[in-house]
From Swiss-Prot:
Family according to the record: Belongs to the WRKY group II-b family.
PROSITE patterns the UniProt entry points to: WRKY
Protein purpose: Transcription activator involved in the transcriptional regulation of terpene biosynthesis in glandular trichomes. Binds to the promoter of the linalool synthase TPS5 and promotes TPS5 gene transactivation. In association with WRKY72B, contributes to basal defense against root-knot nematodes (RKNs) and potato aphids, as well as Mi-1-mediated gene-for-gene resistance to these pests. Both WRKY72A and WRKY72B are not required for gene-for-gene resistance mediated by Pto, another tomato R gene.
Gene name linked to the record: WRKY72A
Bias type Low complexity, positions: 170-185
Renumbered residue ranges of the record's region Disordered: 40-76, 170-200
Lineage: Eukaryota, Viridiplantae, Streptophyta, Embryophyta, Tracheophyta
Organism per entry: Solanum lycopersicum
The name this protein goes by in its record: WRKY transcription factor 72A
GO biological process: defense response
Length: 526
């Protein structure tokens, strides 16, 4: 209808331009409509694309989450399996640990029982102290000389010997394996070459000292344990050595435990000591030494080592000279001092005076014991220089001693004058060394000044006679025995407990030997 109107207007001569405008507007409207349609279609397509993209993204996001959940579940399953494996492994480890712990307790219990058994066994075995300063060559040479001399002395009825200390033994024969250095001291000579040549005095002295140091090695079946009783407030006595405590044990009847120490001066030193309080007097400390040092001793430890070694040597000299078995009917009496030897003034004194002290020994067929009691207070007595005696070559002095099997020997050493008292103080070793050395040197010098010094040739001849003539040695030993017997004749002797001898006067014997340098005179005093 609109077209018809336009056609009429055109036919009637209407304005043609208006029709054209209308047509143009209509065409523009149509184009706009088309544009709108296209744009709408585009929007719809775009929306569809957006929807598809968003759906795809949602799908991708959901897939990712699902994958993550699945991977997390897989990881959790793996962790759970690993936990199960770890639990099984931990159970196995705990089981092995319990088994090992049980085995450890069993081993520790066995070691404790073994240690207790060893301690009990060590208490029965008695070991003597030695210096451990001799070489193997000297020991071999010394053993050969002792064996050869023993074979020659078997022909004699009585085997009497002479050394720096006074000793003699019975005629009971013993096997060469039981030889002791005391069996041939002072009689060493070269019998293998068949000559009468004797050793020089200084070599004889060195041999005697080496023999005294090797008592345990030459006679392993005769061993001694040395106990020292001293008043001490500290847990242990300061004897100069280094010790490490390796155990303790409660003894029956004594509330104080017995501590066990080992010498740590050298890594392989076998020396041990036991420390315990006395049950009767808690202020008294009992220290028992056993073993042999296999290393050089420090200067602060030499005094105690030498003193205990001398006490053990004194006991061993008596036990080795008696019968070989417990059924022996006779036993020889043995008396020896603490071997006050001074070979050189520059060296420290090897042994010390023990004032207010007593030595008690319990003799056994295999395990003799000896105790140094430094706590007794004996009555004082003088020690005059004129008590040095000259012993003549005579056998007019009959021996005085008991032939009983002694199980206990007690030697109470009397003290010296009050102005010469030397109290034992193990905490201050240097002062004791100085006072003891000065005191003994003064006594030796005063004794030597009262005698007329013989020429060196005469002294050498006398020394040669003493070391080579057994009869002279026998006579001299008998004279020494008679003098010692007269000293102990005023004291009580118990037949059951053994020989109890108290020496109220020291018995010094002055032996002078020529030195290598002229004018140098050395005195060796017992």
């Amino acid at each position: 209808m609109h077209m018809e109107t336009v056609f009429r207007k055109s036919t009637h001569g209407g304005v043609v331009k208006q029709d054209i405008k209308i047509k143009a507007s209509e065409e523009g409207f149509v184009e706009d409509i088309n544009d709108l349609k296209v744009e709408k279609e585009r929007k719809s397509i775009h929306n569809e694309d957006d929807n598809s993209k968003s759906s795809q993204q949602k799908d991708l996001t959901g897939d990712k989450k699902d994958d993550q959940l699945e991977s997390a579940k897989a990881d959790m399953e793996e962790v759970m399996e690993e936990n199960q494996r770890l639990k099984k492994h931990l159970d196995k480890i705990m089981k092995d640990y319990r088994n090992l712990q049980m085995q450890f307790h069993e081993v520790a219990q066995r070691d404790a029982e073994k240690t207790n058994t060893d301690v009990k066994h060590d208490e029965a075995e008695l070991v003597s102290l030695s210096l451990g300063r001799t070489s193997s060559d000297t020991k071999k040479e010394l053993s050969k000389l002792i064996l050869s001399k023993k074979e020659n002395d078997e022909k004699e009825e009585d085997n009497l010997t002479l050394a720096l200390d006074c000793k003699f033994q019975s005629s009971t024969k013993s096997s060469p394996s039981n030889l002791s250095p005391e069996n041939s001291l002072g009689e060493v000579k070269d019998d293998e070459k068949g000559t009468d040549q004797t050793w020089p005095p200084h070599k004889v002295l060195k041999t005697i000292r080496n023999e005294e140091d090797d008592v345990t090695q030459q006679n392993p079946t005769k061993r001694a344990k040395v106990s020292v009783r001293v008043r001490c407030d500290t847990p242990t006595m300061n004897d100069g050595c280094q010790w490490r405590k390796y155990g303790q044990k409660i003894a029956k009847g004594n509330p104080c435990p017995r501590a066990y120490y080992r010498c740590t001066v050298a890594p392989n030193c076998p020396v041990r000591k036991q420390v315990q309080r006395c049950i009767q007097d808690m202020s008294i400390l009992i220290t028992t030494y056993e073993g042999t040092h296999n290393h050089p001793l420090p200067h602060s430890a030499t005094s105690m080592a030498f003193t205990t070694s001398a006490a053990a040597s004194m006991l061993l000299s008596g036990s080795s000279s008696s019968g070989s078995g417990p059924t022996s009917s006779t036993a020889s009496a043995t008396t020896s001092a603490l071997n006050y030897c001074f070979s050189d003034n520059s060296k420290p004194n090897p042994f010390y005076n023990l004032p207010h002290s007593s030595i008690s020994s319990s003799s056994h067929s295999q395990y003799p014991t000896i105790t140094l009691d430094l706590t007794s207070n004996s009555s004082t007595s003088s020690f005059p220089g004129q008590n040095y005696r000259t012993i003549a070559n005579s056998n007019n002095y009959p021996p005085r001693y008991n032939n009983n099997n002694s199980s206990t020997n007690i030697l109470n050493f009397s003290s010296f004058e009050s102005n010469h008292l030397l109290p034992m103080s193990w905490s201050n070793r240097n002062n004791q060394d100085t006072h003891s050395q000065s005191y003994l040197q003064n006594n030796i010098k005063s004794a030597a000044s009262t005698q007329t010094l013989l020429p060196q040739d005469t002294i050498a001849a006398a020394t040669k006679a003493i070391t080579s003539d057994p009869k002279f040695q026998s006579a001299l030993a008998v004279a020494l025995t008679s003098i010692i017997g007269s000293r102990s004749g005023n004291h009580h002797i118990d037949e059951k407990s053994g020989q109890n001898m108290k020496v109220t006067e020291p018995f010094p014997v002055l032996c002078s030997f020529p030195s290598t340098s002229p004018g140098d005179h050395k005195d060796y005093t017992l």
